[in-house]
Amino acid sequence: MHNTFTHTKNNTHTKNNTQAKNSGSQTKSNAVSLNKPRKLTEADVTPESIFYQRRKVLQALGITAATLALPASAQADLLAWFKGNEPPKAPSGKPLTFTPSAAYHPDLALTPEDKVTGYNNFYEFGLDKADPAANAGTLKTEDWQIKIDGDVVKPMTLDMDYLMKCFPLEERIYRLRCVEAWSMVVPWIGFELGKLLKLAEPTSNARYVAFQTLYAPDQMPGQKNRFIGGGLDYPYVEGLRLDEAMHPLAFMVVGVYGKTLPPQNGAPLRLMTPWKYGFKSIKSIVHIRLTRDQPPTTWNLSAPNEYGFYANVNPHVDHPRWSQATERVIGSGGILDVKRQPTLLFNGYADQVASLYRGLDLRKNF
């Protein structure tokens, strides 16, 4: 396990890229005009380097041009045929004891559980949305520990059993907005990140919080094979400003739909920051470090012109290759049952978090 944050990512390597995502105090004069939504292709919603790496894998297997015209899900099925042995099935989640929160959108219609657990981005287990559910059974979550260090008074290493007993668990129904312009509504179970950080007592030098995912190539095929993992450098890392991390909305998740997290959703511990794009909500966390300097983040290092440090949901600031004005709602229907809705500033949490970004230029700090 590499408990370090001093690595670099792939593609364009830029230091101290302080691009911040969408901010809260945007006025009408500061807003960007909305583009007319257009139909997205797979190339639109997948980073270009990853899109073409996927094609190289298929071509290396001798797959024809006709096959390349198939949807990504069909290509994934074809690749699975070449694999031979199926990965082990993920264990069923264990029921959790928790208190439903009345303060966090109990009126929202939930995304079906099979979609929440079967439609994921977790490139450590493959590029297609069904890959994590199919391949994450190899993840071993027994004896999991989380290290907290850096600019803290009390550095510590905690195990999951302690965390589950240390904080009362609550269920919060949060909106989830992916940077790829799709969305869900999910009943997460967990506790506030700020409560965890207070255990370690951040010092006055601490300004940022850095997070790191497990690094285990023997369990995560995308870490072992760059084609499977989209060409990213691993382990996956993310970061928040300390005031963001201490905000009550920042949530450490241990369960979903009444049970412990399945591996494909980031077991046993993940972050959820509902006002930011989904890639900020790092999965399978093993290391949290408080730091004075802004930490590197995986997608910003991979494509700094496309993915900023802040990653706040903002319908007025488009991705370079697609509009963020609307989003596709993942529901119970199939491919022909497509519903789109307007994207809300800060994913609908502007009243709670806009003050964090007062005076910040949303176009530069995306």
From Swiss-Prot:
<keyword id="KW-0574">Periplasm</keyword>
<feature type="binding site">
    <location>
        <position position="213"/>
    </location>
    <ligand>
        <name>Mo-molybdopterin</name>
    </ligand>
</feature>
<dbReference type="InterPro" id="IPR036374">
    <property type="entry name" value="OxRdtase_Mopterin-bd_sf"/>
</dbReference>
<feature type="binding site">
    <location>
        <position position="265"/>
    </location>
    <ligand>
        <name>Mo-molybdopterin</name>
    </ligand>
</feature>
<feature type="signal peptide" description="Tat-type signal">
    <location>
        <begin position="1"/>
        <end position="76"/>
    </location>
</feature>
<dbReference type="GO" id="GO:0043546">
    <property type="term" value="F:molybdopterin cofactor binding"/>
</dbReference>
<protein>
    <recommendedName>
        <fullName>Protein-methionine-sulfoxide reductase catalytic subunit MsrP</fullName>
        <ecNumber>1.8.5.-</ecNumber>
    </recommendedName>
</protein>
<feature type="binding site">
    <location>
        <position position="178"/>
    </location>
    <ligand>
        <name>Mo-molybdopterin</name>
    </ligand>
</feature>
<dbReference type="GO" id="GO:0046872">
    <property type="term" value="F:metal ion binding"/>
</dbReference>
<feature type="binding site">
    <location>
        <begin position="281"/>
        <end position="283"/>
    </location>
    <ligand>
        <name>Mo-molybdopterin</name>
    </ligand>
</feature>
<dbReference type="GO" id="GO:0016672">
    <property type="term" value="F:oxidoreductase activity, acting on a sulfur group of donors, quinone or similar compound as acceptor"/>
</dbReference>
<feature type="binding site">
    <location>
        <begin position="123"/>
        <end position="124"/>
    </location>
    <ligand>
        <name>Mo-molybdopterin</name>
    </ligand>
</feature>
<feature type="compositionally biased region" description="Polar residues">
    <location>
        <begin position="23"/>
        <end position="33"/>
    </location>
</feature>
<dbReference type="GO" id="GO:0030091">
    <property type="term" value="P:protein repair"/>
</dbReference>
<comment type="similarity">
    <text>Belongs to the MsrP family.</text>
</comment>
<keyword id="KW-0500">Molybdenum</keyword>
<dbReference type="GO" id="GO:0042597">
    <property type="term" value="C:periplasmic space"/>
</dbReference>
<dbReference type="InterPro" id="IPR022867">
    <property type="entry name" value="MsrP"/>
</dbReference>
<dbReference type="InterPro" id="IPR000572">
    <property type="entry name" value="OxRdtase_Mopterin-bd_dom"/>
</dbReference>
<keyword id="KW-0732">Signal</keyword>
<feature type="binding site">
    <location>
        <position position="120"/>
    </location>
    <ligand>
        <name>Mo-molybdopterin</name>
    </ligand>
</feature>
<comment type="subunit">
    <text>Heterodimer of a catalytic subunit (MsrP) and a heme-binding subunit (MsrQ).</text>
</comment>
<feature type="binding site">
    <location>
        <position position="270"/>
    </location>
    <ligand>
        <name>Mo-molybdopterin</name>
    </ligand>
</feature>
<keyword id="KW-0560">Oxidoreductase</keyword>
<comment type="function">
    <text>Part of the MsrPQ system that repairs oxidized periplasmic proteins containing methionine sulfoxide residues (Met-O), using respiratory chain electrons. Thus protects these proteins from oxidative-stress damage caused by reactive species of oxygen and chlorine generated by the host defense mechanisms. MsrPQ is essential for the maintenance of envelope integrity under bleach stress, rescuing a wide series of structurally unrelated periplasmic proteins from methionine oxidation.</text>
</comment>
<feature type="compositionally biased region" description="Low complexity">
    <location>
        <begin position="1"/>
        <end position="22"/>
    </location>
</feature>
<keyword id="KW-0479">Metal-binding</keyword>
<feature type="region of interest" description="Disordered">
    <location>
        <begin position="1"/>
        <end position="40"/>
    </location>
</feature>
<dbReference type="Pfam" id="PF00174">
    <property type="entry name" value="Oxidored_molyb"/>
</dbReference>
